[in-house]
Amino acid sequence: MAPRGSGRLEAVVFAVMVLFCSGTSTATTAAAPASSPGIQTSSPAPGTGSTRLPGTRASTQQLTMNCSAGGILYSVLGGPFALRCRLSRAPKANETLYAMLAPLPSNTMAAADRPHGSLSHLGNGRAPLSTIYRYNVTAKAGTLDPSAQRSGLAVAIDTESSGDPISFVIYSNMSTRAHIGEYIWRMHDAGGTTADYATIVLLARPPIAAKAPSTNFFLDADVASALVVEASGAYPPSTLTGAWFIDGNRSAESAGFATNVRQIITSDGEVDVKWFLINTKDSPPPSVTPQTTVTFVATWTPPKGFETVFPDGKVTLTKVLRPLWLRKPIVQVSRFPPGYLVCRASDILCDHGDLQWSAGGKIVKSEHQAARTRMHLGSKLCALVQILDIPEDTSLQQSVTYTCTLRGYERIYNWLNGTIELDNMPLRQGRPMLICLAVVMGLFVLGSFLAVVISACLWGSG
């Protein structure tokens, strides 16, 4: 039989053990490590609003933030976008909130590129974050931290704020139209715990304009001539297509033309697209007449996710061209007595081209100004005429070749010139040489006659 009071002693021992075990469990829970700075281990779905700061107990004094954007915010490169966030209470004296724009991990970035049709070889050439964005943060007593890391922007929030909405406005840089990537806008306190976040996708941009640098089409050029249309600023370029039409509704390929497209990527990441309508044949397509028109249609389709940014869907640019269909200019040189050479270049552009003379391989300058006249009334083509004085030379010498060259078309035609050869033999030496030749011939005839007469007299006397 147990001594009296032993039951009470066992109850006391049991109570002490329960208290000891309960204290150990509480201590273990309190010693759990806090979340790593800047990393949210248990992040909510985007756009769900406020989030409890990890490592803290639920309390009415807990600082939370709710951003109006939430979820994924799509925006256009070159345009501003804003995140407006409201704090649940004013931060305490020992609390500081920072707004940080941080890029996604590299593996996530690579995965995000593919759905938007980005170019793989641009992956390693992304512009640094500091050159992509220009920050304009409007907040009560907000200050821009110049020592912010290159991976993001840190903005200190005034500790005296009373919960009024705080706006963060970011402007993307126009010079990086083709930048690839997604970024997450985060709000976190000094301890690195995330309060709320929103994902921002800056990829899509419709073409700014479609323009044709020139509407001159040289049909029988020595190099393949082409009409060019440029569309600037469209991104991603894989969603931009173009088509050529002859006289409104006939495809260029069926009319005997070839087409080509080229993406021009500059050093700062811009992507411009050029389309070419090319005549690859030696002769002009039979369907071309002076009145033939060319229509170019560029269509840009917004990538998936940008439907709200571009509610009208596809963006279409139409360019109607009325080309000046040009044939190869003709250069002719002729002699005009008594001492002039005339060079005439026909079927040339009225504001383009000059004539250059050379004799025996050396450039000579004409004292006469070239004259331009239209081929016919209302024509857009002209004829260019220039006169060159040739000196009279009474001496006997070798022939000289005069060449008249049409300059200004070297990129289109290998050589445009006309030549004439002046033979300086006696018959082409001019009037003095003809007189001399007549005297010589007269003396020869007279001498021959005298020789015959003398021979006859001597023969008769014998």
Curated annotation (Swiss-Prot):
* Ranges of Low complexity composition bias in the record: 29-38
Residue intervals on the Cytoplasmic side: 455-462
* Location(s), subcellular: Virion membrane
Q: Which residues lie on this side of the membrane: Virion surface?
A: 24-433
List UniProt keywords, sorted A-Z: Glycoprotein, Membrane, Signal, Transmembrane, Transmembrane helix, Virion
Q: How does it sit in the membrane?
A: Single-pass membrane protein
Which segments show compositional bias classed as Polar residues? 39-57
- Name-wise, this protein is Envelope glycoprotein C
Q: Which organism is it from?
A: Psittacid herpesvirus 1 (isolate Amazon parrot/-/97-0001/1997)
